[in-house]
Structure formats: C-alpha cells, structure tokens
Amino acid sequence: MLRLLLILLTVVGVVIVLVGVTSKLYRVPTSSMEPTLHCPKDDEIPGCRGDDADRIVVSRVWYRVRDPERGDVVAYELPARGVRRCGAEPGATFVHRIVALPGDRVEVRAGVVRIDGRRLEEDYVERGRMGGPSFRSQVIPDDKYVVLGDNRAQSCDSRAWGLVDRDDIIGPKIATYWPEDRISVR
C-alpha cells in the first residue's frame, strides 16, 4: 500500500513539474472573448469580477512543433502600439482568437471577417457581439497574425493596433481549469 502511494505521489509530482515547465496559467481579465471565455460583469465595479473569471492553461511549447492555426485561442504579449491603444500595462498578456494567417487577404467590417473575399464561418461569435472597428483589406505578411476577440463589440484587438508577431505569441489555450462548472480541454 505504501509503495502504491509513493508511486502515485511521484506521478502527481512529475505532472505538476511538467505542467509548470511547459504551460502558463492565466485569469481572463475582460469580456473580450465572451462567450468562449467568461469574465462576469459587476454593476458595482468597472470591468469584471476577477474571482469568477475563467482561468486557462496556455501551452508554451505547442508552437515549437506546429504552426498557429486559424481559430486557435492564444495568449500573446501585447505589442507596444496595443499598449497605447488599449490602455494596458507594458508587457500585458492578452487572449484572443487567430482569424487570419500569413498569406491571407483579410478584411473586417462590422465584426464580419472575410478571408480572400469569403466570409469566415465563426459559430463562436454571437450575433449581438458583432460590430466594433473595421480592419482594412490587406495581405498578412510572413510571421504575422490577425487576432480578434469573440466579443467583437467589446474587444481591443488587431483592429485597434495591427498584427501580432509570431514571436509574441506565447501559445494556445489548451484547457479551462476554473471555475469548476466551466472546466474543459482545448
């Protein structure tokens, strides 16, 4: 029995170390990714209730073995121009969805994304959350990405400050671990 307990504790310890080395944990600080990632509003205070916000696990190694894909929800370091436009702290980490890849011709109007002239199907964006600024038609250069919040009307994203460099992408969201009623993988 003691041997089984030691094996179990060793396995748990190894998992904790691996997660710590290969992943990073974040709390969702805004409603920009609603309804995919939740940050409940509070009428008494600006912003959202941090204690009830989704907590996510982001892989720091995933993009070492594969390229980012359209639809990935990613954490990234906000570029300097985004810090100014969004009123964020330098070094801030944002979480949004990749909607355009290098080589795509992308345009965003009234929250609707068009890739190479065709409307991008986005079942994760609710009709009432469309809108926000536009993004003029352009071809995305190598190692650059367009990221948007699923709550287009309330998101400070690529439409406000431009493209995200691949080197600034920390990694994709691989799990939601809090609150317990929203636990999910990928």
Regions picked out by a protein language model, each given a short descriptive name:
Residues 2-186:
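Soluble "head" domains of membrane/secretory-pathway proteins
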